[in-house]
Amino acid sequence: CPCALGLATPVAIMVGNGMGAKNGILFKTAVSLEEAGKIEIVALDKTGTITTGEPKVTDVICNKGVTEKELISFAYALEKKSEHPLAKAVLAYAEAAQTDIFEVNNFTALPGNGLSAILGSDKLTGGSMKFISSQTKVSADLNRRAEQLAEQGKTPLLFTRNGKLLGIIAVADVIKEDSPRAVKELQNMGIRVVMLTGDNERTAKAIGAQAGVDDVIAGVLPDGKESVIRALKEQGKVAMVGDGINDAPALTRADIGIAIDTADIVLMKSQLSDVPAAVRLSRATLRNIHENLFWAFFYNIIGIPLAAGVWIPLFGWTLNPMFGAAAMSLSSFCV
């Protein structure tokens, strides 16, 4: 019965979609389910994909004669008026520590460098190692500590009061627990894994090492990811994994877009480990389709001539109508 041929593909796709949905993986189309198993390169956006996307304070290092409470209080006063993403991490840490709250005046933000403000008769400054070291003397010990933090993929923020260094607050976007495992699974499946990030190369390589990604492309701004994906597509079939908002152009440019928000494949659980799961499901579905088609063709190549009596002159084979009806149903059931 040719019904088996008609059922071979749609039944497998329906089952694949159902299994994906059950595990929080939504395939937008049947094509995305089929194509996911063919990808050769997976490009992972760092923020929100490999990392949590929510920077947190990881280290607080005070200068001699300065208490952690003082450092956190003055840092809070400065960062409270900042719009920088890392400021939220400092504010959250300070609020959790129930630090003293001060109000500053004459607040100034210096993009790419740091902050400055007046608190009573004191001048407070905060910012990058490069910026603060140009304003005041940084001891060899704290300079070394700041370098070590940067090598670990963290961002060291230095703070001063009247030109005296108070200490360092390190902020980092923490790696998701399942990221290293997911990267390893993809690599074991023969897929090349690439990390895209806007961070500097040293920080990017440190984060990549934590996640197990050797192929890191640093200094990539959101609007530059599309061109990176275009270049990667010349080397193989590419899947881009990122959020559905900032990475929209890159997700569209890739052969397969996988996102936490909206794309060809949507990850409802926001877990990177669902990426290799989606690839495995796609490959299993394709394998099932091929098996279904093989058995459907094999079954009908033998059965149709038998039902038509073609084999009677050659082998004397005949088919009882009752068995023919049963065989027709069995072919669809097997698929």
Question: What are these language model-derived features?
Answer:
Residues 27, 39, 119-121, 153-155, ...:
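Conserved ATP-binding TGD loop and adjacent catalytic N/P-domain core of P-type ATPases
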Residues 89-100:
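A short beta-strand->alpha-helix segment at the C-terminal rim
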Residues 19, 133, 191, 252-254, ...:
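Membrane-embedded alpha-helical bundles of multi-pass transporters
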Residues 41, 59, 103-106, 215, ...:
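Extracellular/lumenal ectodomain signal focusing on beta-strand-rich modules
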Residues 9, 197-199, 331:
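Conserved phosphate-coupling serine/threonine residues in phosphotransfer and NTP-handling enzymes
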Residues 37-44, 50-83, 113-194, 335:
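ATP-driven catalytic headpiece of P-type ATPases
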Residues 5-78, 232, 242, 250:
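Conserved catalytic phosphorylation-site environment of P-type ATPases
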